[in-house]
Amino acid sequence: MKRSGGPAAPQFPKIREGEICITWIGHASFLLQTHEVNVLIDPIWSKWLKVIKRLKQPGFEIHHLPSIDFVLVTHAHFDHLDRRTLRRVAADQPIVVPMGVGNLVHDLGFRIVHELDYWQTVQLGPLKISLTPCHHWGARFLADLHRDFGGFVIASNGRTIFHCGDTAYFPGFKEIGERFNIEVALLPIGAYEAPTGREVHMNPEEAVTAFLELRAKTLIPMHYGTFRLGFEPLHEPPQRLLASARVHGIEENVLVMTEGRPVVL
């Protein structure tokens, strides 16, 4: 499977009422657009995570972003909460984070910081944003174990997108699927051969199981191929995902995106 990303300016389409446009920037970073608002999730344009080099460039340059209405950050890890990037996109708009993460973003230029507890919902314009639990960890440094972590359900005009954040497989996917009518699930599929040996990331087969338990309609994989966070080959996660999807008869439900290429659903 050949995937390509590059710095060319994306051709963002005109979005009609009822449509949603999804652009994968790379790793866990996404731009979600409706006909009313633009939402940025876990944005990171940095070339380094401390000592870990970015191996694939973002799908487009940060200055090609449209005006951003809301920003969501799933947890405090450096590959999801990048203060340098957040400072560049902050323009006095609201940002939503889990409980305990607000002090990492309050000084970056956001108008208001919404800290959510699990299952809590905030209304931002036409969007309902809900924080869901996951099986991961939230510390940015060794001592700050108080920080929560999770995924976001974004609902607007009958369309519902679930950005899972980082997680291992856990039984909670079934409850998330029961609470929300999820249409599109953005699920992590990389870093499952982690150097630490900790089970905090799903492998591709577990992502398929999670998708089935969520009862979603479309699976978009993420969190692979950008940073070397595990020992698995960079090309392996989507191949294993599609193989597992074929076994379960859901290959047509999997959308492997190309960085920087908008898709309208």
Describe these PLM feature segments.
Residues 2-17, 25, 31-76, 83-88, ...:
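Pre-active-site segment of Zn-dependent metallo-hydrolases
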Residues 70, 94-104, 170-258:
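Cap/insert and terminal regions of metallo-dependent hydrolase folds
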Residues 2-17, 97-159, 239-265:
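Metallo-beta-lactamase
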Residues 32, 42, 75, 82, ...:
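Divalent metal-coordination and catalytic microenvironments
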Residues 25, 29-33, 123-183, 202-205:
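Catalytic core of the metallo-beta-lactamase
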Residues 43-46, 75-76, 134-136, 165-167, ...:
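Active-site metal-binding loops of divalent metal-dependent hydrolases
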Residues 19-21, 89-95, 159-161:
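Short active-site oxyanion
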Residues 49, 81, 105, 139, ...:
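Glycine/Thr-rich phosphate-binding loops of Rossmann-like dinucleotide-binding domains
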